[in-house]
Structures are given as structure tokens and as C-alpha cells.
Amino acid sequence: LFPACTSIGVLLAWGWEQWRGMGLRFITAMLAVLAMLVPWVLLRPAFASPHYPDALPRTATPVAVTFDEAITLLAYAAPQHDLHPGDTLPITFYWRAEQAPAQRYNVWVQLSPSDPTRRIAESHRWLGGTLYPGDLWRAGDVIRETCTRKLPTAMPAPGLYWVRLGLTDETGKRIPFGDAADMLSLGPWRVRAKSLPASPEHAVAYAVGEQIMLRGYTVTLRESLTVTLTWAARARPLQDYTVFVHLVGADGNIIAQHDGPPYQGNYPTSWWLPGDIIPDGHTLPISAPLPEGALLRVGMYDPITLSRLPVYDTHGTRLPDDIVPLVVSP
């Protein structure tokens, strides 16, 4: 090997020079490709004209709401499929200037359930962005603007969520539209859970109507009594139902009760899909200790006719008064 050291050294030096040359040529070629792609892939989309002179797409949902007699939201386009926590929801708004705006507006967009105060995501930006802000618009301009919202991975699901938006002036005051309203609601979108909820403490199996099963319940007693019912959808219910939860004593008299839509109204039964598991909490105003022999009576009814859904046990026997009896320890 020693006699070959000279040759090995020469060949290594020559190979190194060749490799360096190839590497430099490769880097130069990649930089040239990058320089050609950047204007089309990055710069052109970022600085594309927001003007939208063509007819609105057929997939857009009409809105036609005018703010401050100056700016009209003509329509919006958004995915119509179900979402999951962590997904991205892109919404494209189509605005029109009814007249040249006298000021620069800000647009706020939020994502929230049926209660708009419980927003889970929110953004504020100039209307039209920095490329073509609203105070530069001319009468008749139709502007396309896309807002992308990322759904939090820890958001409550399943449930219904709305996109709510509005305009504010330069002082932060909301701009009204219509009959003095200042917040526009779009949607809703159904957000389905990625995983099953925690298993209930007590497993049961009762059929409530033809589409719904009661799979279990959990009772928590602190300053009040919270009953979390676990519903399962066997098929899609035909309408919205109301849940009743009654706490009764050994004599059958009602001690406390709560009636309301499942999931605090954030996921009405008419939106349930086969396979959905819905944890449904109801709070009853009562403090410890519970009276001896207390029971829970649970069921569903039609809020219009007040007719209860029939309740059946695992043997197919219909229960008296269409009530599910649940044991609660004192």
C-alpha cells in the first residue's frame, strides 16, 4: 500500500477538484431554477390584483349586505364538507365598493359556536389588505379577498361553528348594516371529532326513538349536580329534539330538573350522523347531600308537540312514560 500512496494522493486531489466543480455547477443550476420560479410561484400570487371583474363563481353563496352604504359583501365561497379540529378553513369574500370609501375600514373575522361570545379563533386586518386597502377603492370595484382560518386542535367537537365577520372604522367602532346589526353570520360548518370522548362512568344501553341510543352517563356533585349523558347516533335524526333530565326523590317528586337541547345547543340532533358519539352535560341546581333514594329520569321530546320519544331497553320492551331511569348515589 505504501508504494501506492503517491498515486492515491494525486487521484484524491484530482477527484476533490472535480467534485467541487460539480458541486458548484449544481448549486449554480439550482439557483438559476429558483430565480426563474420565484416570480411565478411566490411573487405573482402575493402581488396578484385583487380586482375580480368576472361574474361571481357559481359555487359562491350570495350575501348582498351593505355596510355604511359604501361596501357590499356580495358573496363568499368556502368548502361545504365537514371539518375536523386542526383543519384549515379558507373563505373567499367578494366585496364591491358602492362608492369611493371615505376612510380605511378594518375587517374582523371570527369562528365561534352558537354563542358568538365563545370565539375560538379571530383575526383583524385592513379591508383589501396592504396591497389595495379599502380607502383606495373606486366606485364599482369588485374585490376578491381570501381569509384562511386554522381550526384549533383542542376545540370542542363534534359541534356546529359559524364564521362571523364585520367592519370597523379607523377608531375601532363597528360599522352597522341593515337594521343596525354589526355582525354577519355565515355557515354553519359541522366539525366532527377526531377521537372518541372519555368513557362514561356508568354504561347503559337504551334506544331513544329509532335513531338515538343512550350509551352511558357520568354524575358529578359539587356546588351543583352535573349529569353528562353519552348519546350515540344510529342514524340521522329527522329533527331537533330537547333533552330532559329530572332528579326525583324516593317519593317521585321532582327535586331539580333541566331541559334543553343536547350539547348546550351547539350540536342539534338533526345534524347528527351515524356513528357520532355526543357527550351532553346538564347542570341541576342542587347541593350535597343528595336525598336517599334519589333517581335521575332522562329522555327526549319534540319541543313543538312536547311528545316524548319512545324509550326501549335491550330486550325491546318500551319503558313506562318513555323515561330512562338512572341510579345516582346519595
Regions found by a protein language model. Give the residues of each.
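C-terminal luminal/periplasmic domains and tails of membrane-associated envelope-modifying transferases
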Residues: 38-330
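Signature aromatic-anchored transmembrane alpha helix within multi-pass, membrane-resident enzymes
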Residues: 16-44
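Hydrophobic/aromatic-rich transmembrane helices and adjacent perimembrane loops
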Residues: 1-16
